[in-house]
Amino acid sequence: MKKLIVYFSYTGNTSMIANKIKEKLDCDILEIETVVPYSKDYDSVVNDEQNSEASNHLPEIKKLNIDLSKYDIIILGTPVWWYRPCPAIRTFLTENNLDGKTIIPFATNAGWLGRTFNEIKKLCPNSNVKNEMNIVFESYSDKLKTDEKEINNFIDMIEKIN
């Protein structure tokens, strides 16, 4: 089964995990980027997203230069913003047909997973969303709180899926 890693990363933590998975699995990887980049000021982004959360605002993302139909398994990486998948990932899930695909999500956060995985399942009702992994970092840091062994076990599990 052909695997693709799809992720969005603001602080670099989700990117770090996505690339760790890519190194081990040697599969394709796709970084989601917004058309209008987020501010480099973390507090500004947090405030903006808190204000737009109630409206379910979804940012426009850059065109994907990949044929998703060629992949059976999507390894989906998202930071958790306001207890749910970040807006760019929600845009990706809303705009792309992932029916029949297996989605293995991982979420990076500082300990506030919230409804992230349930929302991914809701956005992909005709996909098989399973084997979710919550990866926790220290607040405002790239220091992992989740044991590295747990992450390696997660990657090993994905590798065994055929």
Identify the role of each PLM range.
Residues 76-77, 105:
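Redox-cofactor binding/interface segments in oxidoreductases and associated redox assembly factors
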Residues 12, 77, 100, 111-114:
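Glycine-centered flexibility sites
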Residues 48, 101-102:
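P-loop/Walker A phosphate-binding loop and immediately adjacent motor/lid segment at beta-alpha junctions
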Residues 79-82, 109:
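Short glycine-rich anion-binding loops that position phosphate/pyrophosphate groups of nucleotides
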Residues 104-146:
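Short, glycine-/small-residue-rich phosphate/pyrophosphate-handling segment
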Residues 68, 94-100, 123-128:
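Short, conserved loop/helix-junction motifs that constitute active-site signature segments
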